[in-house]
């Protein structure tokens, strides 16, 4: 089995419901790294209020400022971090993340039909509720994320523990394979 570089802070971004939290938690476990979910950290700062309630209270600009404060307080250590579905699209937040040392920023991607099905099963994020066309809004957001992220990883719907392990290993092989140092 190859050796994986576990010195990076791995930031996972993607559309809502792509699996940032689920995959991030499994990847962190696979790599024996701490896991942070910025939505959960934000909620904890507001005594358990949901990101939706925080967004409704502060509006988009205030919500982004609260997300930025959450990220500023995030330890700069090797870990896996699941970002909110729109977090990276805020310029200040993007700059804060990309100016950190030794990071890996990866866009998680899924077939659009799978993602759309997942979104139908739970309440939409506030920023997507009043869009004339959900499909167009998602495509536009995805295009912006693709421009901002240097790496893309396609997730598949893994169900068994074996499949989940294979997906985590595939991610690590693609992005975290340690460079072998040849002997002199």
UniProtKB/Swiss-Prot annotation:
Its EC number is 2.7.1.71. Pathway: Metabolic intermediate biosynthesis; chorismate biosynthesis; chorismate from D-erythrose 4-phosphate and phosphoenolpyruvate: step 5/7. Keywords: Amino-acid biosynthesis, Aromatic amino acid biosynthesis, ATP-binding, Cytoplasm, Kinase, Magnesium, Metal-binding, Nucleotide-binding, Transferase. Its cofactor is Mg(2+). The keyword Transferase applies. The keyword Transcription does not apply. Mg(2+) binds at residue 21. Substrate binds at residues 39, 85. It is found in: Cytoplasm. GO terms for molecular function: ATP binding; magnesium ion binding; shikimate kinase activity. Gene3D superfamilies: P-loop containing nucleotide triphosphate hydrolases (3.40.50.300). One of its GO terms (biological process) is aromatic amino acid family biosynthetic process. Binds 1 Mg(2+) ion per subunit. Pfam families: SKI. ATP binds at residues 17-22. GO terms for cellular component: cytosol. It catalyses: shikimate + ATP = 3-phosphoshikimate + ADP + H(+). Its main location: cytoplasm. InterPro entries: P-loop_NTPase (IPR027417), Shikimate/glucono_kinase (IPR031322), Shikimate_kinase/TSH1 (IPR000623). Catalyzes the specific phosphorylation of the 3-hydroxyl group of shikimic acid using ATP as a cosubstrate. Belongs to the shikimate kinase family. Monomer. This is Shikimate kinase. It comes from Chlamydia muridarum (strain MoPn / Nigg).
